[in-house]
Amino acid sequence: MKMTGWKKKLCRGHHLWALGCYMLLAVVALRLSLRLKCDVDSLDLESRDFQSQRCRDVLYKNLKLPAKRSINCSGITRGDQEAVVQALLDNLEVKKKRLPFTDTYYLNITRDCEQFKAQRKFIQFPLSKEELDFPIAYSMVVHEKIENFERLLRAVYAPQNIYCVHVDVKSPETFKEAVKAIISCFPNVFMASKLVPVVYASWSRVQADLNCMEDLLQSSVPWKYLLNTCGTDFPIKTNAEMVLALKMLNGKNSMESEIPSEYKKNRWKYRYEVTDRLYLTSKMKDPPPDNLPMFTGNAYFVASRAFVQHVLENPKSQRLIEWVKDTYSPDEHLWATLQRAPWMPGSVPYHPKYHISDMTAIARLVKWQGHEGDVSMGAPYAPCSGIHQRAICIYGAGDLHWILQNHHLLANKFDPRVDDNVLQCLEEYLRHKAIYGTEL
């Protein structure tokens, strides 16, 4: 097996990491030699020679994530209305709905990590040198629905990347144990060293990401960009596509950052206090520090390593962080404001020409109920084919064609209890594209 070059690069760092890494690679090498009978170096997605094609065929056979037979995912991803209607009708038949995997299921299957990774079809080696040379970091904040977490991890997983998982302190103990069991099977996935109770719309959501930022910067993995996720996210690009998109940013960040409406300005006009939920007080806040104009966006970011370092280390950034702690939903204006701060690496100027909407940024694709409508009449997107939660679309199969036409790296929201067909088709699409480099 000719894995020497990328093996050395992947396994450098702390000796315990290296030991575990080499053991993992040894298992991969053995499996490839015995089962696939082809060399990792031949898995070049740009090569058209027979050997590479044969390897991809065998690899796909072993790692394919097919949707159930009654669903035509190829048609759904192309927007074929007959295929979409069939999937939506199928989703309405309660008797066909599979119950999600439980905490106990994962606690049992992860007793044998190799069996778990093989049965759940995780990709356990880099698919290209370009991906190997451009590791990505993830901050994954979760609190419930263990299967959602495991499927998200599987979809974004690559052995050269690094993943920090923050679990809400308030989550049930069995959920926490199941998360620990899953991540214990991977040397590059770890639990955040500091866990906090996450309260909706409060500072704690930001603190969870900050805790992961600190841990990720201490990792020996030389990651280039950080992406943050929640339990209802799912990627709509392969790891290779993400690497290409991040390289094109050329050190810039990508996140929503716009002028706030008068309604949103109220989020930082008065102080909020937190108990089991957020409470508005009558105490007015001082203006933002350093005469910094405030901008608004969302909780999601695509941030360069240098940006993350300045979030944690720059005194001006720290002053803004302290100031937003008692505001409403600070994650929706902290990152957006730092993205316009002149001292932040990869930021953009205050000027209105640099305003960035959620549709322009690549961080997250979201359908807001208030913006849905007739595209021919100027609406940004068609109505949701799933259901709405807090005015956000939980996607259905009818949304997938539109989703895949966009440039974003991830989309929100998905919930297999609402529509598992759209997730199954997205999984099948991404796995096929990751291995073959082409669509279904």
UniProtKB/Swiss-Prot annotation:
It comes from the Eukaryota. Keywords: Disulfide bond, Glycoprotein, Glycosyltransferase, Golgi apparatus, Membrane, Signal-anchor, Transferase, Transmembrane, Transmembrane helix. One of its GO terms (cellular component) is Golgi membrane. It is found in: Golgi apparatus membrane. It is a single-pass type II membrane protein. One of its GO terms (molecular function) is beta-1,3-galactosyl-O-glycosyl-glycoprotein beta-1,6-N-acetylglucosaminyltransferase activity. Primarily expressed in mucus-secreting tissues. Pathway: Protein modification; protein glycosylation. Residues 31-440 are lumenal. N-glycosylated. Glycosyltransferase that can synthesize all known mucin beta 6 N-acetylglucosaminides. Mediates core 2 and core 4 O-glycan branching, 2 important steps in mucin-type biosynthesis. Also has I-branching enzyme activity by converting linear into branched poly-N-acetyllactosaminoglycans, leading to introduce the blood group I antigen during embryonic development. Its EC number is 2.4.1.102, 2.4.1.148, 2.4.1.150. This is Beta-1,3-galactosyl-O-glycosyl-glycoprotein beta-1,6-N-acetylglucosaminyltransferase 3. It catalyses: a 3-O-[beta-D-galactosyl-(1->3)-N-acetyl-alpha-D-galactosaminyl]-L-seryl-[protein] + UDP-N-acetyl-alpha-D-glucosamine = 3-O-{beta-D-galactosyl-(1->3)-[N-acetyl-beta-D-glucosaminyl-(1->6)]-N-acetyl-alpha-D-galactosaminyl}-L-seryl-[protein] + UDP + H(+); a 3-O-[beta-D-galactosyl-(1->3)-N-acetyl-alpha-D-galactosaminyl]-L-threonyl-[protein] + UDP-N-acetyl-alpha-D-glucosamine = a 3-O-{beta-D-galactosyl-(1->3)-[N-acetyl-beta-D-glucosaminyl-(1->6)]-N-acetyl-alpha-D-galactosaminyl}-L-threonyl-[protein] + UDP + H(+); a beta-D-Gal-(1->4)-beta-D-GlcNAc-(1->3)-beta-D-Gal-(1->4)-beta-D-GlcNAc derivative + UDP-N-acetyl-alpha-D-glucosamine = a beta-D-Gal-(1->4)-beta-D-GlcNAc-(1->3)-[beta-D-GlcNAc-(1->6)]-beta-D-Gal-(1->4)-N-acetyl-beta-D-glucosaminyl derivative + UDP + H(+); 3-O-[N-acetyl-beta-D-glucosaminyl-(1->3)-N-acetyl-alpha-D-galactosaminyl]-L-seryl-[protein] + UDP-N-acetyl-alpha-D-glucosamine = 3-O-[N-acetyl-beta-D-glucosaminyl-(1->3)-[N-acetyl-beta-D-glucosaminyl-(1->6)]-N-acetyl-alpha-D-galactosaminyl]-L-seryl-[protein] + UDP + H(+). Belongs to the glycosyltransferase 14 family. The chain crosses the membrane at residues 13-30.
